Amino acid sequence: MASIKPLGDRVVVEPKNESEEKIGSIIVPDTAKEKPQEGKVIAAGQGRYEDGKLVPLEVKVGDTVLYGKYSGTEIKQGGKDLLIIRESDILGVVTN
């Protein structure tokens, strides 16, 4: 399986899995569920250039991040749903 190496200030995020939701005995279909806004960074680019200097990303592989509801580009890789987003679309890093 090929891996994805994001360019520039982009990161690849694996959205947090939503468990199957039931209301009473009714199963809520995937199309009616809200998209998760939390995920794990699985790949990161080298950073962005400002004034000719490389500025490294603030997030790193393994970080759990929060991002905007409509951020990024959805892709499928190896049967997984992934999201490629810019670092500027990341709202914060979840810490324990």
UniProtKB/Swiss-Prot annotation:
UniProt keywords, alphabetically: Chaperone, Cytoplasm
Pfam family, one: Cpn10
GO cellular component, as recorded: cytoplasm
Superkingdom of the source species: Bacteria
Primary location: cytoplasm
InterPro entries, per the entry: Chaperonin_GroES (IPR020818), Chaperonin_GroES_sf (IPR037124), Chaprnonin_Cpn10_CS (IPR018369), GroES-like_sf (IPR011032)
Family statement drawn from the similarity comment of this UniProt entry: Belongs to the GroES chaperonin family.
Function of the molecule: Together with the chaperonin GroEL, plays an essential role in assisting protein folding. The GroEL-GroES system forms a nano-cage that allows encapsulation of the non-native substrate proteins and provides a physical environment optimized to promote and accelerate protein folding. GroES binds to the apical surface of the GroEL ring, thereby capping the opening of the GroEL channel.
Complexes and interactors: Heptamer of 7 subunits arranged in a ring. Interacts with the chaperonin GroEL.
The name this protein goes by in its record: Co-chaperonin GroES
Native species: Leptospira biflexa serovar Patoc (strain Patoc 1 / ATCC 23582 / Paris)
Lineage of the species this protein comes from: Bacteria, Pseudomonadati, Spirochaetota, Spirochaetia, Leptospirales
